[in-house]
Amino acid sequence: MSLNMFWFLPTHGDGHYLGTEEGSRSVDHGYLQQIAQVADRLGYTGVLIPTGRSCEDAWLVAASMIPVTQRLKFLVALRPSVTSPTVAARQAATLDRLSNGRALFNLVTGSDPQELAGDGVFLDHSERYEASAEFTQVWRRLLLGETVDFNGKHIHVRGAKLLFPPIQQPYPPLYFGGSSDVAQDLAAEQVDLYLTWGEPPELVKEKIAHVRAKAAAHGRKIRFGIRLHVIVRETNDEAWQAAERLISHLDDETIAKAQAAFARTDSVGQQRMAALHNGKRDNLEISPNLWAGVGLVRGGAGTALVGDGPTVAARINEYAALGIDSFVLSGYPHLEEAYRIGELLFPHLDVAIPEIPQPQLLNPQGEAVANDFIPRNVAQS
């Protein structure tokens, strides 16, 4: 099975070390463009663009990268409860059309009560997933070309429709990650690819089995992906030394503050990440070549595969054997590590190199009439 390898645009900052200004670098449009173009040339399928108050806006970043890339896809966040499903569907179709079918979407429900309150969202964990399920139903139906009337607990629309459909049919693929039961239910019912953070293989196997069974109960099959950092070097010793350098400027106070911030979230996935290390710097290799040091201060994906090219490839193939076909990777700094992974890791894997998409000829159309419908030719009698 050929593997889809994604990279990451670090719109929330980048550098040589975690938790310090030492070795940090400015993340401006030029730098992000460099990373995107390297990923495009090296054959990465796409890039994940993060979301939240600590990041630049993912949609604007993605749109700005379209003209400077040829085949790279952009995995952009959908935020239920923050954006209406109709507006989000319109944005999604536009991004897909402008990128010539290179848009992918990542459903993000949010988990930090403080950040959510700042965004005007005051729903608890279960309510957010209810709202996300309703949002996704409306979003998908709109992109499928339906005119939608929907009267749910959280979402209400009447006569919602899109005038301009997406390039990808039936609609651009929808990704989603979540470890709670309600999250897995949502994935099983509505998404195309379920993402997990990089837990040890036995835990990932268990999670995939649960989601696969839930999807089968709905008569569906979904794909699986995993989010990991990678520290790959020419030798295993060099890779482990690089891992230690990455956290060499971290002090206990910074780790404690980060763990306290993570503790206030209601994310089951974040709780599972934190449990892998419990905020302690010792015993960070939690599974062969799987290192939890990143998660001492980084929210979300907190584990890295560490080793030389053949070793890391072997670990990736272990995950692939569980049914994972998409790997969303990152490394510090992201420009250099995109090259390093392409040079040291990719030759040991069956990487699916995307083709440059051919321009899609959109149907010619006149200006929308009364902002309501597209004029069609009327047969002459």
UniProtKB/Swiss-Prot annotation:
Keywords: Flavoprotein, FMN, Monooxygenase, Oxidoreductase. It is an enzyme of class 1 (oxidoreductase). It catalyses: an alkanesulfonate + FMNH2 + O2 = an aldehyde + FMN + sulfite + H2O + 2 H(+). Gene3D superfamilies: Luciferase-like domain. Its EC number is 1.14.14.5. Homotetramer. Catalyzes the desulfonation of aliphatic sulfonates. This is Alkanesulfonate monooxygenase. The lineage of its organism: Bacteria, Pseudomonadati, Pseudomonadota, Gammaproteobacteria, Enterobacterales. The gene is ssuD.
